[in-house]
């Protein structure tokens, strides 16, 4: 199954081993699910994981990003400008990639996205697919 991970899922997985977000990342690393991304998403992952307040080491960041790239699907999605993103326009990229790949979008910020069946919380994804 193709999935798109909002950045908060990566941060949660690194901060909270043994919880839903880390179970999702483990499923990606074991190739049960294929992460989809584009250059904008990778840039955000890299930028956020390097925030000084998160205190992740370069090794930890690489341990997260390298398998995502290695096992993932890099795409160039079509813009979907007809869908409003009033809360956070920067989240549009995740939605565009998810729609392009027909993927499930997993986020801790459901309010930032349209209410659609393939956009779900980590808990809902784990309950349904893991």
Where are these regions (language model features)?
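Active-site neighborhoods of divalent-metal-dependent phosphate/nucleic-acid chemistry enzymes
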Residues: 70-108
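Residues at secondary-structure transition points
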Residues: 19, 36, 56-59, 85, ...
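PIN/NYN-family metal-dependent endoribonuclease catalytic core
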Residues: 5, 15, 21-52
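Structured helix-beta-strand junction loops
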Residues: 30-32, 71, 101, 116
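Extended, non-globular alpha-helical segments
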Residues: 39-69, 124, 128-130
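Hydrophobic "anchor" residues on beta-strands that sit immediately upstream
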Residues: 2
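Acidic, PIN/NYN-like endoribonuclease modules and their adjacent C-terminal/linker elements
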Residues: 102-130
């Amino acid at each position: 199954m193709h999935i798109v991970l909002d950045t908060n899922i990566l941060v949660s997985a690194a901060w909270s081993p043994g919880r839903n977000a880390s179970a999702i990342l483990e499923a990606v690393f074991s190739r049960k699910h294929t992460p989809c991304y584009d250059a904008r998403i990778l840039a955000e992952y890299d930028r956020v994981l390097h925030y000084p307040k998160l205190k992740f080491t370069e090794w930890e960041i690489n341990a997260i990003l390298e398998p995502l790239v290695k096992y993932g699907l890099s795409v160039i999605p079509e813009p979907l400008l007809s869908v409003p993103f009033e809360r956070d326009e920067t989240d549009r990229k995740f939605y565009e990639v998810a729609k392009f790949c027909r993927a499930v979008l997993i986020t801790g910020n459901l309010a930032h996205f349209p209410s659609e069946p393939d956009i779900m919380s980590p808990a809902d994804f784990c309950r349904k697919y893991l």
